[in-house]
């Protein structure tokens, strides 16, 4: 049995500025030690507010924030075992790489030998050994990020907070840094909490993801869980691309949408309950019209490099997005095939707690 240790806990935390609507509204969650977490959501959803509350840059309006078993609401930022890597890295331009990394240690008045040992070790961890005397202005974007991370880990924090640190990098470098950050977190064994609005970053890097919207956590779980089993339309639409249509759950393992009934793997709904149905674009296969479960007309097509993105319309006017390596032409009449496992049925207004209980009931039956 694997024993996990909770390092950070939010208990009914609300953050409100003046009389404005809450930025965070009664949020509760736990962060386990040694994992890579991502707070994911659109602008204004509350993800950066959570980061600042953990760091001590903001104070909660209501609720308790725990570090281990200790409430830290009133503990100032400089007394928390937490370091933040900011979006702009916040490096000192007048100091070289070595002095940037050593800055926090000098504030603590460590001996010169101890500072040198810690700085060299931090630079080795981020693959910047030999760059000690380099000026910050001479560093690339990726190298500056490594300096910022070295400055964070040199203080041996229990938690590292990363506030959209990849957003200023180009696509190729951003992808490279995703791998580097994930590898670094595994080697260090420190808890990372990463903020982003980029779902691909979240899926690629995280052990656990919290999806936020309008100050509330919509869903939490592993990348695979959230992608394959979204709890509601917002999560399904925000995490990857989705085809979402209205439907009706006829009975266990049978759902109706686009005026046809299909076998599915979902259960635990009321007979004839109104639901929403999700099918991912990559789970749709283009076939001849007569072999398809759905008959559609090709409306448009884009080449995306590794696949074609095909937009289709069925006889009722529903739009369907397909990812395929098969080339078709606009106005072609085609069929769309899919397996029962490709259909995901969502209950309207279901909470995450109710959703988890329903999934547990699946496991018990199986």
Swiss-Prot record:
GO terms for cellular component: ATP-binding cassette (ABC) transporter complex. The keyword Manganese does not apply. One of its GO terms (molecular function) is ATP binding. The keyword Translocase applies. It is a peripheral membrane protein. Residues 8-239 form the ABC transporter domain. It is found in: Cell membrane. ATP binds at residues 41-48. It catalyses: ATP + H2O + polyamine-[polyamine-binding protein]Side 1 = ADP + phosphate + polyamineSide 2 + [polyamine-binding protein]Side 1. It is an enzyme of class 7 (translocase). InterPro entries: AAA+_ATPase (IPR003593), ABC_SmlMolc_Importer (IPR050093), ABC_transporter-like_ATP-bd (IPR003439), ABC_transporter-like_CS (IPR017871), Mo/tungstate-bd_C_term_dom (IPR008995), P-loop_NTPase (IPR027417), PotA_ATP-bd (IPR017879), Transp-assoc_OB_typ2 (IPR013611). Belongs to the ABC transporter superfamily. Spermidine/putrescine importer (TC 3.A.1.11.1) family. Part of the ABC transporter complex PotABCD involved in spermidine/putrescine import. Responsible for energy coupling to the transport system. The complex is composed of two ATP-binding proteins (PotA), two transmembrane proteins (PotB and PotC) and a solute-binding protein (PotD). This is Spermidine/putrescine import ATP-binding protein PotA. It comes from Listeria welshimeri serovar 6b (strain ATCC 35897 / DSM 20650 / CCUG 15529 / CIP 8149 / NCTC 11857 / SLCC 5334 / V8). The lineage of its organism: Bacteria, Bacillati, Bacillota, Bacilli, Bacillales.
